[in-house]
């Protein structure tokens, strides 16, 4: 994963099939950014302004008992003021039992509707860090300047898909957050293009990019956020292959990517985006939101890879547009 900047000083409206979308410009979205206020020296001794290869990446942080805001998930900026992430990031308990005591076939994904954070908890305990490369200063991993830690903003409102209403089993693992202010003045931040603005098609077998600060067992971060953003290229899979690998039906809004023993999204990467690079425009489009898959520690230990199941953003166009236009 990596970084780049763009400063936006205006609000833009875009017409989508007769609907205006606030805070979005399809000419400026999806472009990488550069930090202009400081310089870094790379491993080869070259000094320059660092670029942010995923300036739409954000950290979802929740206030812990000690008062610190811990990174629990990733997310993706989709306008100057809005973020997409996963609904299960706000789940209090995992592995609930169905009536009768049997766990479901989706790795304990079953839940009750009252197992998520309350609306008040989401608004008062959750913040979003934008324009960041790092979760904290740590020179060993190239996190040496405070500006690499981005800017943290509060959430003014949000909307959750029907994830909890269907016991966390039938898709809709999506949340859209509205930030208290725009990212106009945030160095290193930009938003990804939406896949229906303009419409983009992905060919079967194409690669997508994942980004986040999730755990990395291979580097000793088994249950902790990695200091520096990491970026991975993942191969897409057909829904048929995905269902075969899981041995059961998958959510209606699934978008699947291949798992590998040494290359996969891990705990803490949930809610982050999968983007598709459009070569002719050199821009990144968010296609999906990381939802669930195999445990990285188990994969490293030799477990058979299955498929990573993500939430297809294109299946939630109306949900996204309606929320943004209520701003």
UniProtKB/Swiss-Prot annotation:
Glycosylation sites: 207
Active site: 88, 173, 270
Effect on the protein upon substituting residue 29 to Y: In jn2; male and hermaphrodite fertility is normal. Suppresses premature sperm activation in a swm-1 (me66) mutant background
Activity regulation remarks: In the male gonad, probably maintained inactive by swm-1.
PROSITE patterns per the UniProt record, alphabetical: TRYPSIN_DOM, TRYPSIN_HIS
GO CC field: extracellular space; secretory vesicle
Similarity remark: Belongs to the peptidase S1 family.
Protein's recorded name: Trypsin-like protease try-5
């Amino acid at each position: 994963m990596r970084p780049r900047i763009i400063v936006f000083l205006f609000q833009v409206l875009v017409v989508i099939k007769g609907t205006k979308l606030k805070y979005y410009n399809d000419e400026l979205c999806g472009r990488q950014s550069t930090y202009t206020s400081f310089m870094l020296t790379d491993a080869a001794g070259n000094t320059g302004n660092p670029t942010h290869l995923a300036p739409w990446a954000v950290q979802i942080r929740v206030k812990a008992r000690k008062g610190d805001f811990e990174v629990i998930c990733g997310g993706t900026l989709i306008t100057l003021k809005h973020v997409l992430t996963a609904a299960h990031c706000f789940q209090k308990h995992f592995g609930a039992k169905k009536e009768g005591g049997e766990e479901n076939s989706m790795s304990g994904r079953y839940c009750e509707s009252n197992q998520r954070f309350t609306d008040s908890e989401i608004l008062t305990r959750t913040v979003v860090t934008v324009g960041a490369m790092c979760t904290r200063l740590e020179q060993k991993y190239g996190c040496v300047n405070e500006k690499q830690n981005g800017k943290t903003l509060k959430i003014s409102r949000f909307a959750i898909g029907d994830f909890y209403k269907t016991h966390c089993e039938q898709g809709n693992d999506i949340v859209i957050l509205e930030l208290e202010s725009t990212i106009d003045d945030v160095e290193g931040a930009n938003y990804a293009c939406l896949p229906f603005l303009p419409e983009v098609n992905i060919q079967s077998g194409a690669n997508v990019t994942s980004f986040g600060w999730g755990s990395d067992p291979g580097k000793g971060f088994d249950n902790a956020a990695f200091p520096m953003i990491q970026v991975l290229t993942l191969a897409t899979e057909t829904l048929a292959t995905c269902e075969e690998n899981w041995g059961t039906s998958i959510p209606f809004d699934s978008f699947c990517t291949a798992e590998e023993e040494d290359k996969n999204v891990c705990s803490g990467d949930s809610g982050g985006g999968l983007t598709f690079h459009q070569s002719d425009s050199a821009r990144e489009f968010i296609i999906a939101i990381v939802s669930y898959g195999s445990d990285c520690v188990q994969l490293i230990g030799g477990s058979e890879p299955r498929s990573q199941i993500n939430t297809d953003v294109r299946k939630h166009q109306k949900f996204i547009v309606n929320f943004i236009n209520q701003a």
